[in-house]
């Protein structure tokens, strides 16, 4: 996996959850914060990552 932030600049509006990758193979955090597992160093710590399967609907927000 790689950071999709470049592909989806408005990922926070396109995805249902904001996925924060603190490190590789991190475990999911409680609450609405979901951590994407297997993120590479390309994301950088604290970078927002998201897979298309985590997106709520199409790549473009319906609103």
Curated annotation (Swiss-Prot):
Keywords: Disulfide bond, Neurotoxin, Postsynaptic neurotoxin, Secreted, Toxin. The keyword Secreted applies. SUPFAM superfamilies: Snake toxin-like. This is Short neurotoxin 2. Blocks both the muscle-twitch response to nerve stimulation and the response to exogenous acetylcholine. Belongs to the three-finger toxin family. Short-chain subfamily. Orphan group XVIII sub-subfamily. InterPro entries: Snake_toxin-like_sf. Transmembrane segments: none annotated. In contrast to other snake toxins the action of this toxin is reversible. GO terms for molecular function: toxin activity. It comes from the Eukaryota. Disulfide bonds join 3-21, 15-39, 43-49, 50-55. It is found in: Secreted.
């Amino acid at each position: 996996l790689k950071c999709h932030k470049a592909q989806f600049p408005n990922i926070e509006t396109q995805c249902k959850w904001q996925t924060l990758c603190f490190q590789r193979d991190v475990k999911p955090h409680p609450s609405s914060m979901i951590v994407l597992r297997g993120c590479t160093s390309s994301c950088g710590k604290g970078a927002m990552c998201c897979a298309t399967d985590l997106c709520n609907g199409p790549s473009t927000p319906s609103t």
